[in-house]
Each structure stands twice: as C-alpha cells, then as structure tokens.
A protein has these predicted regions:
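ATP-dependent small-molecule kinase phosphotransfer cores
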Residues: 46-127
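Conserved lysine of the Walker
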Residues: 21
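Hydrophobic anchor at the beta1->P-loop junction of P-loop NTPases
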Residues: 13
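Walker A (P-loop) phosphate-binding loop of P-loop NTPases
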Residues: 18
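Conserved phosphate-donor/acceptor-positioning beta-strand/loop module used by diverse small-molecule
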Residues: 112-115, 145-168
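Hydrophobic positions on the alpha1 helix immediately C-terminal to the Walker A/P-loop
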Residues: 24
C-alpha cells in the first residue's frame, strides 16, 4: 500500500438526492475491505464542529472562512438555511484539513457520501447567484487548497431519482417533502442544472459516474480509478 506516512485519500460524492451516493459509498467500503485496504472512518470529518476561536487564532483559517462568506453574500436572498449550509461547507473543509494534518490516521481511504461541493450547491438552492463566475471561483479556491481528495460527480436520470426517493423512509430532505411527481421532477431538473453550472468550472478533475447502473458496478469503477490514479504505491 505504499509509504506508511502517506496522507489518507478522501472520496467525496456530490449529486442529486436519490442518486445512490450513500449506497455506492457502502459498496466501495465493502470492496476496499475485501481487498484488505484500510477504510478510515469519516466520523472525525462529519462530526467536526468548528469553533470561532479556530478562525480568530489562525490567519490561514480566517482567510479561508472569508472566502466562504463571500460565496454566501453572492446568493440572494440570504437566509438562515443558506448560512447553515455555508457553515456546513466550511465544517467539511476544516474537517478534511484537520483530518490530513493531524497525523493520527494515515495510509487509508475515507469516503464521504456528501461534503463541501454538495453543501455549496445546497447553499444556492432556489436562490439567485448574483455573479456565478465569482461563486464558482470561491468553490475552486477552497477545493484547490485540499490534497488527496477525489470528487465524484454522480449523474442520475431524474425519474430514477424520484423512484429511489419514494422508496426511502418519510421525513427526508427538502425535495422528499414534495408529493407531486411532476413538481418533484421539475425541481430535480432545476437542481441538476444548478449542479452543472456551479461545478463544471469550479471542481477540476472530478470523475463522472452514471448512477443508473448498480452500486457495485459503480463502486468498482471508482475503486479502480482511486487505486490507479491517486493511491498507487510510491
């Protein structure tokens, strides 16, 4: 598996609800463990809650937080929900950064079924981005600061997404509350277009997976890419 002091690799998914991100993440974990590759817990990333003293005491972190704030102020109207997603995106960024520099977990692969990019798209959901170029530049800036992160763009047919969402337990996300399929399809198409506009210029090098296939087949493709391009022995 290469050098023992290598930073962990992080796989981060983004895409429509019902795309099968979580299911595919579990399939990847299973394949990696069968190959005796260490799968690192994402708990330290997901559960990380930044403290404002982290921003005050570190100029680097403060400068990065300002980038997230700039992105927030490019979306109208500013709401509590958008602020929540801005802080969530920053939490993921800081969690990944700390995960890499802590030195406690090395030589393995960590899988996030959603993360920074998903939070940025959610922050702009049904809002007006006053300057898309600047918004995308904010995302690109913070993404480029991270090492060893593989972004997976999950494409899905909206009708399959609807079918999977309807099969979930009730009380899910915002879109799952829409009961009319035609209205839900319309909202998914809007979000799909938003994903494309926001990510096509800001997330360089992302791999695109068509999630209409079975999770195991998609997991195999991602594992092959991960091992071949980003986790090969030195």
């Amino acid at each position: 598996m290469g050098q023992a002091n290598r930073k962990p690799v992080i796989i981060e998914f983004y895409g429509l609800p019902g795309a099968g991100k979580t299911t595919t993440a579990f399939a990847i974990q299973k394949q990696l463990r069968n190959m005796e590759i260490r799968v690192l817990s994402p708990k330290r990333i997901i559960d990380h809650q930044f403290k404002y003293k982290e921003i005050v005491l570190s100029k680097e972190i403060r400068d990065v937080y300002i980038i997230f704030l700039k992105a927030l102020f490019l979306v109208r109207p500013i709401t509590r929900e958008r602020i929540r997603f801005m802080n969530l995106a920053f939490n993921y960024w800081l969690g990944i950064k700390n995960f890499h520099i802590s030195g406690k977990q090395k030589n393995g692969i960590c899988i996030l079924d959603q993360g920074i990019v998903q939070a940025f798209v959610s922050m702009a959901y049904l809002g007006k981005i006053t300057n898309k170029e600047k918004y995308c530049r904010c995302i690109q800036q913070v993404v480029d600061m991270l090492d060893n992160v593989i972004f997976v763009n999950c494409r899905i047919n909206p009708d399959i997404s609807i079918m999977r969402m309807r099969a979930r337990k009730p009380n899910g996300g915002r879109l799952q509350q829409i009961k009319n399929d035609n209205e839900l399809r319309k909202m998914l198409q809007i979000q799909m277009l938003q994903f494309k506009k926001i990510t096509e210029k800001s997330v360089k090098g992302a791999i695109t997976i068509h999630m209409n296939e079975q999770a195991e087949a998609n997991a195999e493709k991602i594992v092959e890419y991960c091992l071949g391009c980003s986790y090969k022995s030195e």
